[in-house]
Each structure stands twice: as C-alpha cells, then as structure tokens.
Amino acid sequence: ACVAFQAEGRQEVIRLKMPSEGTLVIPDLVRGEVTFAWADEQDHVIRRADGSCLYHLATVVDDHAFRISHVIRAEEHLSNTPRQLFIADALGYPRPEFAHLPFVAEPGSKNKLSKRKLQKYLKDPEFARLQAEGEWIAERMHRATDVETFNPVLVDFYQQIGFLPDAVLNYLLLLGWSLDDSTELFTREAMMEAFTLERVNKAPASFDPAKLQSFQEKWFQKLEEKKKVALCVPFLQQAGFAASPPDCNLAPRLNEILRAAGDRVKIAGDILRFEEFFVSDEALDYEEKPFAKRIHSLEVIDRLRRLSEQFQKVDCFDAAHCEATVRNFV
C-alpha cells in the first residue's frame, strides 16, 4: 500500500503509535485522579504531509522549552492529556502538573456559555436587562450595538460601558473558587495570596448578570471621588457632552453630580443618565405650546402645591433630604 501511495505521489504523515491496552491515571489538581483507557486512544497524526507539526506535538515541545511546570486550562482539554503525556514520556521530558478548570455556564444552566446562543440568553430577564443597559450607553456614545458583536458574553462589552476590570475579575474568581463562606471582595494582591487550585470547584458555575453587577457596584462605590470623575469623563466626551481636553469646570461639576447621584451611578457609563446637567439651557429644545398647556393644567398645579407643602416640612434642605421628599411624594 505504501509503495502504491508513493507511486501516486502521496506524501506520508507521521502517526503516534499509542498503547492499545492498560490505563493511564492522571493526577489532576482540580479533579483528583482521572483514569483513561489506552484502548480509547487513536494513533494520532503528529506531523502533516507538508512537514508541519500538529498541536499535540508542538505544545508538548513548546511547554518543555519554556520550562512550564503547571498546565492550567479549560476542562475540554482534559481528553488531550493522555496523548500529550505519552509524547512527553517518549521524548524523555518531565511531566508537568495538570489542572483542568470548569467552564462558565449559561444563566440557570450547566451548559457552556456561548456567543452562538445569544437569543436564548436574552430570554433571561437579568441578561436582557444588562444587554439593554449596555445598548443604551453605547448608543449615546454613537457606537454600534449589533447584538452579535456587542453583548454580555464578550469581555469588550463590559469595557465599553464602564465596568471596572477589578470587579469583573473578582466576579470570575468566585464563579469557580471560594476562600470561605463570607469573603467576597478581593484585591488582585489578595487574590494572588489566597488562591489555591485545590479550592477550585469541579462543576461549572452559571453566569449570573445580577451578581456581576452587584460586584461592579461595590467596587465602584469604593473608588475615590477623583477616580470616579476620571472614569466618567471619557463617556461624556464620546457622547459629545464634554470637550476634549475637558474645560477646567468639568471635574468640579461632575464631582458634585456624582455625590448627588450616589449609588445610582454603578458603572462609569451611567453618568450619561444625567446628561441634562451637561447641556446648556440654550441647547434644550422642546415645543413650548404643548409644554405650557401641560404645566398649567389644574392637576399639575395641585401636585406642585402639595409638593411645596412637603418641602416646607423639610428641616435639612440638602440634596439627600430633597430627593427623599420627592420620592416619598411620588
């Protein structure tokens, strides 16, 4: 057969002759001992007909060349491990330690999160709400919001609307690992000090948009006022509400708005929800006649009179008490 193939001009490939009997036990730092039967392994091609090497040979040689001691990767690569260890043994390389991590699962499911299932995820109320909030911010910055390239499955989504890297990292850390039953917030330094592979969960954890937003809110509120201002300025600039470079009055005004807004600004992009404070009165455009008709109606006048009476009862006339008065009235 080989002679006939050569006569046809075919180029040979090189296959790895695998054992056909026995088992291989892999000590995995996350999953414990994992057993594979050699009979389930094929004789894999390790060099193509054009002379190039395939992934399994290349990655083993590459890891050895760079003195890799630990191979930490997603669980779908677990099935690749037997052939890679067989290659390492054949080449006389020391075996690295392996740790196969669980994937991030869909909301309310144990299936792997995938950008190809967006329409399914958008039926989840929290996922849909996060998508809508992101689109609202992106549209005001004149950015494309095509759901295939702008959605909560992609890291760029969070970067574009103002999520903090530390908040996203903190959330991802606790998706598959925990220190104890109470500690939630970790700085990067604390993560590096506390993290061990032994406490990584074997099972995948579902992506929870509400929990991620909760981490973002906590991290944003921890920031100094100066840092919050610095994060919000680019969003105002891209939306056309601030000059580039910004004028000297922007930072003090923005600081006051952030103080008054309190926890209503959870991500930097939320500052665009207060866009009316960055538009001059002359730039406001509205139809005067319909507005005058509505504002002079007896119902509106009565409401304003009753609201005025509530304000007269306020002892401390500051932003917090005024807001509480209006909210209670409404």
Identify what each model region corresponds to.
Residues 1-124, 154, 179, 313, ...:
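Active-site cores that bind ATP or allylic diphosphates and position pyrophosphate for catalysis
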Residues 48, 66-77, 105-170, 175-180, ...:
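Conserved phosphate-binding loops in nucleotide/dinucleotide-binding enzymes
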Residues 79-99, 133-146, 157, 238-241:
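Short, solvent-exposed cationic patches
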Residues 79-83, 99, 149-153, 163-170, ...:
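Generic recognition of stable, solvent-exposed alpha-helical segments in well-folded globular domains
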Residues 87-90, 161, 171-175, 194, ...:
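Generic, well-ordered alpha-helical scaffold segments in large soluble proteins
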Residues 179-238, 242-260:
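Active-site-proximal acidic segments at structured loop/helix or strand boundaries
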Residues 225-330:
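Small-residue-rich helix-loop
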